């Protein structure tokens, strides 16, 4: 009996200690409004950054600095996740699977190969999968909250179109490194002076050969600090205006700054740059006659009707435009003799598109069934069109939207962070 009691007590002691260790591992490190950041989350993010740095042969600042940056990232993530819950934003498994499939395809691989690559790096596919889900959720939250803050005037579009025209369609893209030495929303002269001095010291270190990514991770207040300040590739027209003006006439590896903005002082590095070629699109001019089957007109009779029209046209006994005006069920083109004008064939449904692309100029197709009904089509002409010129207004709008979205996202995240209740429970995070 004593042996049983001792054994039970020993097992209870082991279980308690094991549980205690788990609790210590998952201690609440930060209270963020109605949520928390766990110690395990901080360690996981720090380890991920270290693993990525090792893979990319990148040096990192001290663990203390890295921990501080990780905590800031997780605070912002927690606030966004809480907002997502309030908004009822969810990503279904099919949506998630499709996204991961797209990621693999864009990388020229398969989901199975992606699994293997993750495993070789010691990353569980399920962990990766849930991380992608979280990124999709935060992306939805940002779009929902930031989009309403963006307004683009016709004059802005017109001005950018003029700029694009002046550049002759040869748009430059820059791969930028970014360090932000921030100051408060309403800085004193002392705040500004202190931030400027720090930015100048950072620039001096970089000019003396210090690694940009390491300095960015240690010192930057920007949203990409944990990525070594890497902003990726940016079109000159989609980057913040201050940056777009500053990078003009620069060369690879140039350092720029400090540049003052409302957020602080920026230091940029031109990691690389490249030009963008004009996009040319093959357009087709065509016309068609559409016959829609109905209760009165069977599918078979509709096809036979177009077959007869084709025979008459090939024999020169009928006029295509007149047949279209009299019989076509497409009201948009019937009044124009079936003329669809110039268009990128990809705007048409697959059956129509594929048939049209297979025709020679002047050739009349066999009757073709699509989701709209039966078509008889004729290819009238072909041309290669400069898509950049044709779509320049849409492009200008998208570039302006991207620029403003990036700027407003930073502002929105800062406002959300500044207004949140945040309590660091571990004193070493406050010191």
UniProtKB/Swiss-Prot annotation:
Notes on the domains: The PPIase activity resides only in the second parvulin domain. The N-terminal region and the C-terminal tail are necessary and sufficient for the chaperone activity of SurA. The PPIase activity is dispensable for SurA to function as a chaperone. The N-terminal region and the C-terminal tail are also required for porin recognition.
Gene label: surA
Signal peptide range in chain numbering: 1-20
GO molecular function, one term: peptide binding
InterPro entries: OMP_Chaperone_SurA (IPR050280), PPIase_dom_sf (IPR046357), PPIase_PpiC (IPR000297), PPIase_PpiC_CS (IPR023058), PPIase_SurA (IPR023034), SurA_N (IPR015391), Trigger_fact/SurA_dom_sf (IPR027304)
GO BP annotations, alphabetical order: Gram-negative-bacterium-type cell outer membrane assembly; protein folding; protein stabilization
Protein name, entry field: Chaperone SurA
Entry's transmembrane regions: none
A Pfam family hit: SurA_N
């Amino acid at each position: 009996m004593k042996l049983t009691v001792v054994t039970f007590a020993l097992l209870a002691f082991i279980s308690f200690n094991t549980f205690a260790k788990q609790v210590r591992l998952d201690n609440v490190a930060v209270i963020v409004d109605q949520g928390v950041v766990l110690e395990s989350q901080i360690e996981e993010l720090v380890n991920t950054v270290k693993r990525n740095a090792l893979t990319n042969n990148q040096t990192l600042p001290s663990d203390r600095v890295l921990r501080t940056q990780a905590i800031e990232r997780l605070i912002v993530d927690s606030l966004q996740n809480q907002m997502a819950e309030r908004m009822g934003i969810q990503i279904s498994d099919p949506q998630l699977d499709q996204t991961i499939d797209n990621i693999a395809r864009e990388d020229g691989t398969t989901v199975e190969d992606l699994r293997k690559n993750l495993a070789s790096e010691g990353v569980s596919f399920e962990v990766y999968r849930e991380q992608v889900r979280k990124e999709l959720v935060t992306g939805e939250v940002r779009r929902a909250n930031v989009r309403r803050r963006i307004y683009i005037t016709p004059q802005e579009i017109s001005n950018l179109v003029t700029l694009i025209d002046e550049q002759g369609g040869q748009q430059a893209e820059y791969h930028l490194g970014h360090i932000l030495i921030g100051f408060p929303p309403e800085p004193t002269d002392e705040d500004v002076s202190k931030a400027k001095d720090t930015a100048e010291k950072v620039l001096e270190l970089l000019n003396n050969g210090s690694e940009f990514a390491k300095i960015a991770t240690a010192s930057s207040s920007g949203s990409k600090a944990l990525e070594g300040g890497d902003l990726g590739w940016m079109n000159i027209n989609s980057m913040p205006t201050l940056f777009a003006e500053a990078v003009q006439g620069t060369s690879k590896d140039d350092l720029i700054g400090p540049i003052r903005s409302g957020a602080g002082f920026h230091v940029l590095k031109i990691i690389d740059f490249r030009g963008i070629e004009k996009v040319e699109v093959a357009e087709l001019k065509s016309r068609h006659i559409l016959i829609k089957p109905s209760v009165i007109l069977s599918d078979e009779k509709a096809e036979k009707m177009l077959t007869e029209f084709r025979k008459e046209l090939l024999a020169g006994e009928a006029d295509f435009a007149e047949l279209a005006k009299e019989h076509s069920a497409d009201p948009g083109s019937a009044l124009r003799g079936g003329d669809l004008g110039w268009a990128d064939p990809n705007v048409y449904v697959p059956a129509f598109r594929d048939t049209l692309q297979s025709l020679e100029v002047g050739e009349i197709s066999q009757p073709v069934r699509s989701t709209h009904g039966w078509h008889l089509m004729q290819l009238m002409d072909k041309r290669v069109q400069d898509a950049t010129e044709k779509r320049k207004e849409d492009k200008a709008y998208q570039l302006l939207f991207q620029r403003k979205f990036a700027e407003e996202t930073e502002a929105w995240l800062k406002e959300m962070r500044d207004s949140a209740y945040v309590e660091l429970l571990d004193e070493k995070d406050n010191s």
